[in-house]
Amino acid sequence: PLRLGTCNGRPRVAIIIGGLGLNPDITRQALETLPPQVTLAFSPYSPNLQDWINRARERGHEVLLEVPMEPEDYPENDPGPYTLRARAQPAETVRRLEWILGRGAGYFGVINRMGDRFVRSPGGMSAVQGALRNRGVAFIDSGIASASGGGDLRASADQPLDTVLSPPAIDEALLRVEAAALQKGQGLGIAQAYPLSLRQVASWAAQVESRGYQLAPASALARIR
């Protein structure tokens, strides 16, 4: 059988589900319904985070840890007490990042949670890049940091899947991930931990390979970027 992440020559599609670990029921739904090729991203604020990571890995999933970063509308939109701030000194950025990275073990990389203001901070992203490189941790960009730095392993999302929470909108976004894969050999989509998103992704994942694509974990895309 083909190992996860092994290229078979087909266009690669990868999906990340973010925001897991905060709601136990939704997190269990993800673990029970999604195939192992789907990458699961957990909030660092999750209770029982390590247990969730262990359960995800036991089911064959790759795991990412979310790093909350300052959005444009902060503090009205506040991703939590360890948010990486755009105007923070590099030492403070690294201190917060180290707290996040120390919350669990067994993840291959991190992904930004929000952060459209922080990623434009050269000093902030440089500090993040250095800390991740020292640990050998990948940086996956949710799509807003494509012009900024990251870790040594890197992939950038092509398509948010559930900006509009309706089955037709999510299905259309998944088709755009496929289109990106046809155009450049790989496509990466990101959905959040909503029951509807999980159902639509599970349904799509069950038949996407029959249409000529390879469903791959996010790290497989990061390695060839």
Where do the PLM segments sit?
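Solvent-exposed loop/turn segments at secondary-structure junctions
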Residues: 19-22, 45-48, 69-73, 115-119, ...
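Glycine-rich, charge-decorated loop segments at or immediately adjacent to ligand/cofactor-binding or catalytic sites
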Residues: 52-54, 75-76, 147-153, 224-225
